C-alpha cells in the first residue's frame, strides 16, 4: 500500500507541477521589482521605491507631482525606460499565459490517451489552469487601455499558487486511481488488479515525463529571458533616478 501511494504521489506531482511551472517561472529571479507600474497611452507611472514617476511617451517626467526640466540625456533615459516597460511587461504576461495553455493542452492529450476522454482529471486540470491564470492576473492586471503591474502581489501569488496545486493534487490522485481501477475491472484482463493498476500508473507517469522533457528547455529559456529583462529594467530605473538626482 505504501508503495502504491508513493507512486500515486509521484504521478500527481508530475502532472500538477508541470502545469504550475510556467506560472511561477517568470518570477524566479534574484532581482525583485520594487515598484508598481501603471501603463496607459498617456503615460507610464512608476510608484514605490522610485517615489511617484510619470513618464510620457516622449520622455517628459513628472516626479512626485512636479514637472522636471530635463537635459537631452535625461529625456532619452526616461524615454528608453518607459519604452522598455511598455514592451517587456506585456511580453512577460503573454509568454506566461501561452506556456500555461501549452502545458494544459499537452497534459490533456496525455490524460485522454492514458485515462480516456471522459476522465475527470481533465476537468480538474482545466480548473487548475484557470485558477493559476487568475493568480497571474493579480500580478499583471490587463485593462482595455493598458495594464497595471502589482509588484507586492508576487510573493502572495507564489504562495497561493502552491496551495492551489496542493489542494488539487488529492482529487487528481483519487480520480486517477479510481479510473484506472474501473478500467482494469471492465477489461477483465489478468489476475492481479493492483499490479495492473500500477503498470498503468507507470505508463501515465512515463508519458507525462516525456511531455515534460519536450517542453522543459523552452520553459527554462523563458524564465532566463524574463529574469534578464527584469534585471535590465531595474538597472534602467536606478540609472534614471541617479541622473534625476
Task: Tell where the protein language model's regions lie, with residue ranges.
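Sec-dependent N-terminal signal peptides
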Residues: 10-18
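N-terminal signal peptide c-region/cleavage motif recognized by signal peptidases
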Residues: 20-22
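Disulfide-bonded cysteine motifs in exported proteins
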Residues: 24-25, 222
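Heptad-repeat coiled-coil alpha-helices
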Residues: 98, 105, 112, 141, ...
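A cross-kingdom marker for long, charged
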Residues: 195-245
Amino acid at each position: 500500500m505504501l508503495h502504491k501511494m508513493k507512486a500515486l504521489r509521484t504521478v500527481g506531482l508530475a502532472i500538477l507541477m508541470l502545469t504550475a511551472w510556467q506560472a511561477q517561472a517568470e518570477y524566479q529571479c534574484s532581482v525583485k521589482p520594487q515598484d508598481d507600474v501603471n501603463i496607459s497611452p498617456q503615460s507610464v507611472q512608476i510608484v514605490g521605491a522610485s517615489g511617484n514617476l510619470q513618464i510620457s511617451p516622449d520622455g517628459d517626467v513628472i516626479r512626485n507631482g512636479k514637472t522636471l526640466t530635463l537635459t537631452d540625456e535625461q529625456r532619452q533615459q526616461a524615454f528608453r525606460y518607459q519604452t522598455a516597460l511598455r514592451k517587456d511587461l506585456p511580453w512577460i504576461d503573454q509568454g506566461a499565459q501561452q506556456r500555461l495553455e501549452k502545458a494544459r493542452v499537452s497534459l490533456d492529450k496525455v490524460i485522454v490517451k492514458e485515462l480516456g476522454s471522459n476522465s475527470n482529471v481533465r476537468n480538474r486540470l482545466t480548473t487548475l489552469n484557470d485558477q493559476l491564470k487568475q493568480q497571474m492576473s493579480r500580478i499583471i492586471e490587463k485593462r482595455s487601455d493598458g495594464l497595471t503591474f502589482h509588484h507586492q502581489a508576487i510573493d502572495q501569488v507564489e504562495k497561493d499558487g502552491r496551495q492551489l496545486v496542493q489542494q488539487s493534487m488529492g482529487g487528481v490522485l483519487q480520480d486517477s486511481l479510481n479510473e484506472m481501477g474501473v478500467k482494469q475491472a471492465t477489461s477483465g484482463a489478468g489476475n492481479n488488479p493492483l499490479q495492473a493498476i500500477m503498470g498503468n500508473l507507470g505508463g501515465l507517469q512515463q508519458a507525462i515525463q516525456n511531455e515534460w522533457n519536450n517542453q522543459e528547455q523552452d520553459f527554462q529559456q523563458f524564465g532566463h529571458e524574463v529574469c534578464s529583462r527584469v534585471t535590465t529594467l531595474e538597472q534602467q530605473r536606478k540609472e534614471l533616478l541617479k541622473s534625476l538626482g
